[in-house]
Amino acid sequence: MLKLKKDFIDTIDSVYLIKITDDLYSICEHRGNTFFEFFDVFFPDFNEERKIDLNETKILFTKSCAADRFKDFFVKEITSVIPNSRAIETIYLQPFYYLLKRLQNGGDVNQYVSSVKRTNIYKSVDYEIVIEQLNEQNNLQEIYKYNSFGMVGSADKIHEELSNYVKTGILWGREKSTLFPTISMEMLQNYILQTTNSL
């Protein structure tokens, strides 16, 4: 299948088929100008008659970035799927808030990651602090659940993260491994197991 050109990814609330590997596809929706939602739905190929309501489908994560960052693995627009109309996620990981605190405190603040709630989803500077300094032991739930607002580097990291999620059931990629290096796969497996058992 032909890949989309950059200019094709310009319609708000359009749904796209994305290719993760040669035999693994998923769905992404373009929301609110620069937002892209990735869903917990995967298949070896896509049948246009497949009935999917994204309002009833789990959102794995939301990214905000320019459309051309995804042009290499967006395959085509899908019109048979019901688009998601739920509110866009407002809570994200913020790995750079500590820099502001470092300036305010004269430079003696160690690096850490915060969680923030965006008060204006269209302006990256408008947010309030939810948890200023995430602790890898006490805040594993928040660390696992939320993601960074933007995307650094190529979309290959998302390919890899989604592919590994299908294989392992754990949604964890290079970005979080860098931000939280002491969180092991064993910790994540135990967390997923505990979460599943509590349902």
Per-region residue spans from a language model:
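Short N-terminal edge-element motif at the start of the domain
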Residues: 1-62
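Context-gated lysine
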Residues: 3-6, 19, 51, 58, ...
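Intrinsically disordered, low-complexity segments enriched in small/polar residues
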Residues: 14, 23, 110, 120, ...
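Acidic surface patches and DE-rich sequence motifs
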Residues: 20, 103, 135
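Intrinsically disordered, low-complexity regions
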Residues: 33-36, 57, 97-100, 110, ...
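Amphipathic alpha-helical interaction segments
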Residues: 47, 69, 105-106, 180, ...
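Long, low-complexity intrinsically disordered regions
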Residues: 62-130
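Glycine-rich, aromatic-bearing surface loops/beta-hairpins
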Residues: 122-199
